[in-house]
Curated annotation (Swiss-Prot):
One of its GO terms (molecular function) is NADP binding. Pathway: Amino-acid biosynthesis; L-proline biosynthesis; L-glutamate 5-semialdehyde from L-glutamate: step 2/2. It comes from Burkholderia ambifaria (strain ATCC BAA-244 / DSM 16087 / CCUG 44356 / LMG 19182 / AMMD). CDD domains: ALDH_F18-19_ProA-GPR (cd07079). The gene is proA. GO terms for biological process: L-proline biosynthetic process. Its EC number is 1.2.1.41. This is Gamma-glutamyl phosphate reductase. Belongs to the gamma-glutamyl phosphate reductase family. HAMAP family: ProA.
Length: 423
């Protein structure tokens, strides 16, 4: 296969389809989503058979249990896909909305209209459910998309792509609006991320090594985040019960997510009260604690252990594991300075009953999501009321934070006049 020609052809077809998608009616887009949902229900066994072949090959390669779990399309996974498609269909269609419409002294009206981005390239790893999630959001937001899934899920993704194409055709929409790259050749990724004539934005969903490669090689703009080094700062005016709940949930609800707390900052004035019960809670849940000298002194006196001395590298690390770095700080200023220096601009939280300190934290912490008295685990499109998300961005331009339908659109100015000319 000539990868360069193959990818160029996908791009050309996607660009053509994007024009039809931009003018597609809400009814047609919703009909396509419903048709795909019904096709998944109808062909569930065929999907599971294709997926079983992918899973068997993954096991032959010796891939670990966690990877196999992400790859597997269980009955519950298929049900979740169907529910997700219908949920996206139920969301308000942002395309064509005109906001901020106002008259100018010249007599013209000026507003902003929400429009699709165009063609979105999505690169992801082992989860075949992303094929459906990404296709649904791109379809509803009026975009065409090129999906490049993981090589281990080729048969699963091909089977899902067939059903998506059927759904688009049934609704009178171009099948080329959703295309799945049908090769495991890594050169396909290299071509996709440089096709500036055909692709408007790349959304990567994967591990750090993938994102780093794309940052270095991509010429197409990206919506991305590299790390999720999330912090909780417990202020000396915090409510102890709230602090225990937030700190427990932020770390132990799930260890492998990008919105999990990786560093706990504790004000020196509350350390002796908070750390002993919190340390015992983490110990009971087998969380390894990497601590500075001040935190060690408090925890050791309370009989909490074992403890590991933190190094500077710990403040930079996204563990994605039952490991937590703990540092005692002088107060709010030191906490904000630490977060802005070591953090990844993803999600950070303060626990405090002091309104002024809470507002300072919200203003001064330079992150995509900043929270007061709430777990960092809430940084999620569904929890934020977006309905669904295609990913999370910690960049400052275009989309920031969880990216839902509106994040896959942009605004253009529209002017309504009555024959006016500029004086």
């Amino acid at each position: 296969m000539d990868i360069d020609q193959y990818m160029t052809d996908l791009g050309r077809r996607a660009r053509h389809a994007s024009r039809a998608m931009a003018r597609a009616s809400t009814a047609a887009k919703n009909a396509a989503l419903d048709a795909v949902a019904r096709a998944i229900e109808r062909d569930a066994q065929a999907l599971k058979d294709a997926n079983a072949r992918d899973v068997a090959r993954a096991r032959e390669k010796g891939l670990d249990a966690a990877f196999i779990d992400r790859l597997t399309l269980s009955d519950n996974a298929l049900k979740t896909m169907v529910e997700g498609l219908r949920q996206v269909a139920s969301l308000a269609d942002p395309i064509g909305e005109i906001g901020n419409l106002k008259y100018r002294p010249s007599g013209i009206q000026v507003g902003q209209m929400r429009v699709p981005l165009g063609v979105i390239g999505i690169i992801y790893e082992s989860r075949p459910n992303v094929t459906i999630d990404a296709a649904a959001l791109c379809l509803k937001s009026g975009n065409a998309t090129i999906l490049r899934g993981g090589s281990e899920a080729l048969e699963s993704n091909a089977a899902l792509a067939k059903l998506i194409g059927e759904g688009l055709e049934a609704a009178g929409l171009p099948q080329d609006a959703v295309q799945v790259v049908a090769t495991a050749d890594r050169a396909a990724v290299g071509k996709l991320i440089t096709m500036t004539d055909y692709v408007d934005v790349i959304v990567p969903r994967g591990g750090k090594s993938l994102i780093e490669r794309l940052i270095n090689e991509a010429r197409v703009p990206m919506i991305k985040h590299l790390d999720g080094i999330c912090h909780v700062y417990v202020d000396d005016r915090a409510d102890l019960a709230k602090a225990l709940t937030v700190c427990d949930n932020a770390k132990t609800h799930r260890y492998g997510t990008c919105n999990t707390m990786e560093t706990l900052l504790v004000a020196s004035g509350i350390a002796a009260t908070l750390l002993p019960p919190l340390g015992k809670l983490y110990r009971d849940k087998q969380v390894e604690l990497r601590v500075d000298a001040a935190a060690r002194a408090v925890l050791a006196e309370a009989g909490v252990g074992p403890l590991v001395d933190a190094t500077d590298e710990d403040w930079h690390t996204e563990y994605l594991a039952p490991v937590l770095a703990i540092k005692v700080v002088d107060g709010l200023d030191a906490a904000i300075e630490h977060i802005n220096h070591y953090g990844s601009h993803h999600t950070d939280a303060i626990v405090t009953e002091d309104h002024d300190r809470a507002m300072r934290f919200l203003r001064e912490v330079d992150s995509a999501s900043v929270m007061v008295n709430a777990s960092t685990r809430f940084a999620d499109g569904f929890e934020f009321g977006l309905g669904a998300e295609i990913g999370i961005s910690n960049d400052k331009l275009h989309a920031r934070g969880p990216v839902g339908l509106e994040g896959l659109t942009s605004l253009k100015y529209v002017v309504l006049g009555h024959g006016e000319g500029r004086q």
